């Protein structure tokens, strides 16, 4: 199984890339974590937010492997505990599908793209900056794997 994070935005600060790389390399090959950065639509194009999100949605869809289960990160998504995420990860592993986590741009994700997803989750009730979302998501996916494998990283 591959865990793919398709995130709108490029040119993250070095600390984001360092943290992402650290968690990604900790995961084993059978639960690989991969980042696919999606070019954001220019905010100076004169397009409406809906048009910009639709353009970004097309780029996201083009970056996803066929058959991957899509999970959108959204402020209105379902709250998951860390243990709940590990249980969900175990279920996805059992299905044998790649899982793609979709992270929108400044305006969020296109409504049609969200509707095509197998689920919506949120990392927090707080508003998080996009660089933090990448770090938190990668850490939580690693922690979920650690719970499943009884790795000492997670001590609850």
From Swiss-Prot:
GO terms for molecular function: rRNA (pseudouridine-N3-)-methyltransferase activity. CDD domains: RlmH-like. It comes from the Bacteria. Its EC number is 2.1.1.177. InterPro entries: Alpha/beta_knot_MTases (IPR029028), RlmH-like (IPR003742), tRNA_m1G_MTases_N (IPR029026). It catalyses: pseudouridine(1915) in 23S rRNA + S-adenosyl-L-methionine = N(3)-methylpseudouridine(1915) in 23S rRNA + S-adenosyl-L-homocysteine + H(+). SUPFAM superfamilies: alpha/beta knot (SSF75217). Coiled coil: none annotated. Pfam families: SPOUT_MTase. It is found in: Cytoplasm. Gene3D superfamilies: 3.40.1280.10. Its main location: cytoplasm. Keywords: Cytoplasm, Methyltransferase, rRNA processing, S-adenosyl-L-methionine, Transferase. S-adenosyl-L-methionine binds at residues 73, 104, 123-128. Specifically methylates the pseudouridine at position 1915 (m3Psi1915) in 23S rRNA. HAMAP family: 23SrRNA_methyltr_H. Belongs to the RNA methyltransferase RlmH family. Homodimer. This is Ribosomal RNA large subunit methyltransferase H. It comes from Bordetella avium (strain 197N).
